[in-house]
Amino acid sequence: MSAYCQVTGRKPGFGKQVSHSHRHTSRRWNPNVQRRKFYLPSEGRTITLTVSPKGLKTIDRDGIESVVAKIRARGEKI
């Protein structure tokens, strides 16, 4: 599962981890993304999306139909 939110587009952040002796090693901050199933009444089927908590709030606010329409308008296959 990739660390990418399909609703908000949130991706991992990259940076350095600094030890007590100030050695720098690469690391990444993964977003909190989970796979969730949503029911689309217009199509009569469920879809699975990888979403972050902010993406879930967006779905609650705007509705799953409009969010899926925006994702498909970007050219992403669901």
Swiss-Prot record:
Listed under GO cellular component are: ribonucleoprotein complex; ribosome
Lineage, top-rank taxon, reads: Bacteria
GO BP annotations, alphabetical order: translation
The alphabetical list of record keywords is: Ribonucleoprotein, Ribosomal protein
- Pfam families reported for this sequence: Ribosomal_L28 (PF00830)
Q: Spell out the molecular function terms from Gene Ontology.
A: structural constituent of ribosome
Region of interest (Disordered), residue spans:
1-28
What family is this protein classified in? Belongs to the bacterial ribosomal protein bL28 family.
What's the protein here called? Large ribosomal subunit protein bL28
